Amino acid sequence: MEQDINNQTGKKIFLNEECFLELDKLPQHVSVLGVSGFGKSNILLHFLKYAIDNDHPLIFVNGKGDKELITQFEHYQTSAKQLSPEDGFDTVKLVALKNTSAKIWSLDDRIATIKYNPFK
């Protein structure tokens, strides 16, 4: 179902509209912008899943420390390999099993594969 709303400029904004990105554009930098609740984390999760499933190099910078995004990412990693921390695997190992080029940087050191913190 497509909805439209008017923003402050009077132009229509369409919600629930499909958006496509050409595969040859994936090596480029991607920026996802929007107000709180706009779905930025959800969009990024789709990029992460695609990169992991297709063994594309990936650097995931979680500068905000978004715990919900990390939780969803961990769930995807676990369900994708049908493994869980109870099986003796942590998130970093699951990422390495699914995609050896994946790197995660986060303010939360428990899930980071890269320990460099430019803010310290």
Swiss-Prot record:
InterPro entries on file: P-loop_NTPase (IPR027417)
Entry protein name: Uncharacterized protein MPN_514
Organism: Mycoplasma pneumoniae (strain ATCC 29342 / M129 / Subtype 1) (Mycoplasmoides pneumoniae)
